[in-house]
Amino acid sequence: YWVHMDKIRPAVVLTRDVALPYLSNITVAPIFTKVRGLRTEVIVDERNGLDHESAVNLDNVQTVSRDSVFDQIGLLTFRQKRELAWAIVLAFDLEIRLRDI
């Protein structure tokens, strides 16, 4: 999705789909063009509707107004969703083993 944050940028919506119509705020992970190779990043690219390789950054999760989120760009693959789950575990320092997710 495109999201109004510090500027209009792509982001992954982390809030579950079923809750979206009922919430005034939505949690998102911004996508940055700079890929730093961190374990708290998930690589996305043209397959996901972007112009070039970028990184979903789970160290910068934000909650924004639902009105700030617009125009779906693309979808994550199953593998990227698993990587996203693991990046969340690492970013929030959760005590979960990889095989548990």
Task: Say what each PLM segment does.
Residues 7-46:
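Compact nucleic-acid interaction/catalytic patches
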